[in-house]
Amino acid sequence: MSSSNPFVSIVDDDLATTKLFHEALSENIHNVRVVSFTDPVLGLEHFSENKDVYALVIADLRMPSLNGLELLKKVKTSNPKVRTILMSAYNFDEDLLFLKYMEEGIIDSAIDKPVTMNILFQRVTDELQASQLTRAK
């Protein structure tokens, strides 16, 4: 794996989820550097220091100190080319801020938890392909 490969970040305060997703993506998605954080503030700091080599940020909706919506808004404001996935065990359809951010392109995709690995891989692959197209422009 080259240090020029883009980052894919998983940010979820649940350590078991973070570890599972990190291992699964590291083993199955190639040509990326997978990093994971249980503290959204640390995840945002890493992104800020490396924002030009990020392809994708996957964030859980409900986290202490900085929720997924706030985190992904900061990510997109800092680098609009980075793709974003919001995941949650809660219903997105009634969250007006979520709907607004989807419409504005702050959130590129959403995943309902629990999620199968097949759905996770497909969504991540789709967003990485979109990232390559965006970064090529």
PLM regions: where:
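Alpha4 helix (beta4-alpha4-beta5 surface) of REC/receiver domains from two-component response regulators
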Residues: 70, 91-110, 118, 122
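Receiver (REC) domain active-site loop signature in two-component systems and cognate sites
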Residues: 63
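Short amphipathic alpha-helix used as the core "switch/output" element in two-component signaling
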Residues: 45, 69-81, 100
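Two-component/phosphorelay signaling modules centered on CheY-like receiver
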Residues: 15-35
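A Lys-centered signature of the CheY-like receiver
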Residues: 113
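Hydrophobic/aromatic residues positioned on beta-strands within the core alpha/beta folds
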Residues: 87-89
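Active-site residues of response regulator receiver
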Residues: 12, 60
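Acidic, metal-coordinating helix/loop segments flanking the phosphotransfer/catalytic sites
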Residues: 36-56
